[in-house]
């Protein structure tokens, strides 16, 4: 970051989305903004494992409204310090990572994806929860450190989220007159391979599909919380001009965001 001053000439807005905030204030986004020399505004936002896609949605909205031309979206996910290592069903799959995405109305890039549509939904659930907060100091019921860490009811999450996300993506495609068979890639939240494969099979109507349709970088990097779907996108975006893809996150909240993309690059991409 310290070696990147001058980027303020390119980026005027910056959004930081993460499922785990490093602190309440000053905003980490504003600290990064200062180091990069970005003018305008920056802010943090938290929407669980949909923090990255919700931040991209906000960036798109800012550009569409005329508030900005280019927005830098940064999504650090450092989950491992927040995990209870005494509970294997919770800790074993998490990893740490960070992604950055440039959202712009600049049509001159030789590697560009057009956002065709976004669809978002939230539905309250305690099945994925953390009570870590400054309010703990004033709470009437004392809790141990273990009580404040990441918690999930995995079986309930699987049973409730999989059909919810599959129906959500299916509806999103119908809203845009896109057949599931016309989707070249599904870049989904990297919760686990079982959830990803089940959701995709429900959307396309069969569990007999090429594994490249729904990339699984989780096998190497683990569950990277809200950064996972963009890790999948970055590592497996071998589309041709005119191909469509779906980025979809889902997680604590519950929160779900589906982003429909069209690859529009006019020339071969750089290696």
Region spans (language model):
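Short beta-strand segments
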Residues: 17, 46, 71-77, 103, ...
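Conserved beta-ketoacyl condensing-enzyme motif
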Residues: 4, 8-48, 53, 173, ...
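Flexible, glycine-rich active-site loops centered on histidine and acidic residues
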Residues: 67-98
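Conserved active-site "lid/cap" helical segment
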Residues: 4-12, 85, 135-184, 195-199, ...
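Short acidic, glycine/serine/threonine-rich loops at helix termini
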Residues: 25-27, 57, 82-87, 256-260
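Single conserved hydrophobic/aromatic residue that forms the stacking wall/gate
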Residues: 1-7, 11, 263-271
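Claisen-condensing/thiolase-fold acyl-transfer catalytic domains that form or cleave C-C bonds
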Residues: 20-21, 39, 47-64, 166, ...
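Condensing-enzyme catalytic core mediating Claisen C-C bond formation in acyl metabolism
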Residues: 87-159, 163, 167, 250, ...
């Amino acid at each position: 970051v310290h070696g990147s001053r001058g980027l303020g000439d390119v980026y005027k807005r910056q959004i930081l989305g993460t499922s785990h905030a490093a602190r309440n204030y000053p905003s980490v986004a504003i600290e990064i903004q200062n180091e990069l020399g970005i003018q305008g505004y920056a802010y943090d936002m938290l929407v669980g494992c949909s923090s990255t896609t919700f931040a991209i949605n906000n960036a798109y909205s800012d550009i569409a409204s005329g508030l900005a031309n280019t927005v830098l979206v940064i999504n650090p996910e450092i989950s491992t310090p927040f995990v209870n290592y005494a509970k294997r069903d919770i800790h074993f799959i998490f990893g740490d990572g960070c992604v950055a995405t440039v959202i712009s109305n600049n049509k001159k890039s030789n590697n560009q994806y057009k956002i065709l549509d976004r669809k978002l939904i939230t539905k309250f659930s305690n099945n994925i929860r953390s009570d870590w907060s400054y309010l703990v100091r004033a709470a009437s019921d004392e809790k141990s450190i273990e009580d404040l860490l990441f918690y999930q009811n995995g079986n309930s999450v699987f049973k409730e989220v999989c059909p919810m996300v599959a129906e959500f993506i299916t509806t999103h495609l119908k809203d845009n007159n896109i057949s599931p068979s016309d989707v070249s890639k599904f870049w989904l939240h990297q919760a686990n391979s079982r959830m990803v494969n089940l959701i995709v099979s429900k959307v396309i109507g069969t569990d007999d599909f090429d594994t490249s349709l729904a990339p699984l970088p989780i096998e190497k990097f683990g569950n990277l919380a809200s950064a996972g779907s963009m890790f999948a996108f970055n590592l497996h975006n071998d589309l041709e001009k005119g191909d469509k893809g779906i980025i979809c996150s889902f997680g604590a909240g519950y929160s779900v965001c589906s982003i429909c993309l069209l690859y529009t690059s006019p020339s071969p991409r750089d290696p």
